[in-house]
Amino acid sequence: MKKTFLTIIAFLLALSINAQEWVGINKSVHKRIQEKLISSSENSIIVDVDINGFYKETVKTDKGDMLIISGEDMAAMPIKGAPNLPMYPISMIVGDYAEMEIAIIKSEYVDFENVDVAPSKGNFSRQINPDDVPYTYGDMYQEDAFYPAQQASLGEPYILRDFRAQNMMVYPYSYNPVTKTLRVYTYMRIEAKKVSDNGVNQKVNRKRNNKVAPEVNALYERRFINYPSKETRYSFLEEEGEMLIVCVDEY
């Protein structure tokens, strides 16, 4: 019984993988999106992003066969009626008070013609069968313009333990529904720059730890692209020590 169950799981996974077809830009071999920190300071964070291709999946719509575009480690933009394209978040540490703005310093792209990209079905409850949700087409399907218009944006600042952070949202793919052109940004240099000390959700009067436990340090390294530049400011607690607890006899 167990062997049969595992066989079924393997079969379903194979179907899921085979449903998507990899389209490489320079090579046929799949390569996930690459991010690289170029520089990081209190006033500026510069990141390079390289994209080697995308996955396409054919779906049936009332307008015929269309494509859903996706990428590894990316999330679909959940805007109902908009072209179903993925976005990629990059988490970064920002100043405790900083208001940041984002800009594309330079970029390169490749256009794919005669591509029909399906619209997103948006967000809905897990109790709803996705196949029961119809495809609807938003106003952008009537506009001769690329969507999204920007290739990067900033999320709301948030506090994670010792740091104030912000997500750099990267949009490597954009689509013009009128010309049926899919634009793939194969390279982007993105800068998040401090413009003031009037940012929202400021980290005020919160003491930062001088020592960071190894597991927390590992969390920071995985999450924040610019965390290594902070390492010289903090010492890490490499091993657990003994604790002295003082209390009255009743306890």
Question: Which sequence ranges carry the predicted segments?
Answer:
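Bacterial Sec-dependent N-terminal signal peptides
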Residues: M1-E21
